[in-house]
UniProtKB/Swiss-Prot annotation:
Role description: Binds directly to 23S ribosomal RNA and is necessary for the in vitro assembly process of the 50S ribosomal subunit. It is not involved in the protein synthesizing functions of that subunit.
UniProt cross-references to InterPro entries, sorted A to Z: Ribosomal_bL20 (IPR005813), RIBOSOMAL_L20_CS (IPR049946), Ribosomal_protein_bL20_C (IPR035566)
Name this protein carries in UniProt: Large ribosomal subunit protein bL20
NCBIfam families: rplT_bact (TIGR01032)
Gene it is expressed from: rplT
Organism field: Campylobacter fetus subsp. fetus (strain 82-40)
Length: 117
């Protein structure tokens, strides 16, 4: 059987990696080996941060809800307890959106939560 050299296959593989490494700094988007190393690392960061993003947004929503609650003279934890007792099933994303964009509606929800306590 004849020996097969990797010319075309290697070029395709290198082009694929270098295409994914566009925008990287210096040799990390020009040299295959450096690009491959950086690409592997960047995919690890992407995997990690897709999970961290969920935590970060939840923290942001809680901060916003807490700030709006304190304007309505109630703490975040008492507000969430009141919502649970009043059987109001709104998630933190929706509550934070209401707190930011519709203060009157949020105040009405706070009043219901206070009543349930």
């Amino acid at each position: 059987m004849a020996r097969v050299k990797t010319g075309v296959v290697r070029r395709r593989r290198h082009k694929k990696v270098l295409k994914l490494a566009r925008g990287f700094y210096s040799a990390r988007h020009k040299h295959f080996r450096k690009a491959k190393e950086q690409l592997e690392r960047s995919l690890v960061y992407a995997f990690r941060d897709r999970r961290a993003k969920k935590r970060d947004f939840r923290r942001l929503w809680i901060i916003r809800i807490n700030a709006a609650c304190r304007l309505n003279d109630i703490s975040y934890s008492r507000f969430m307890n009141g919502l649970k007792k009043a059987n109001i099933a709104l998630d933190r994303k929706v509550l934070a959106n209401l707190a930011m964009n519709d203060a009157a509606a949020f105040a009405a929800i706070v009043a219901e939560a206070k009543k349930a306590l």
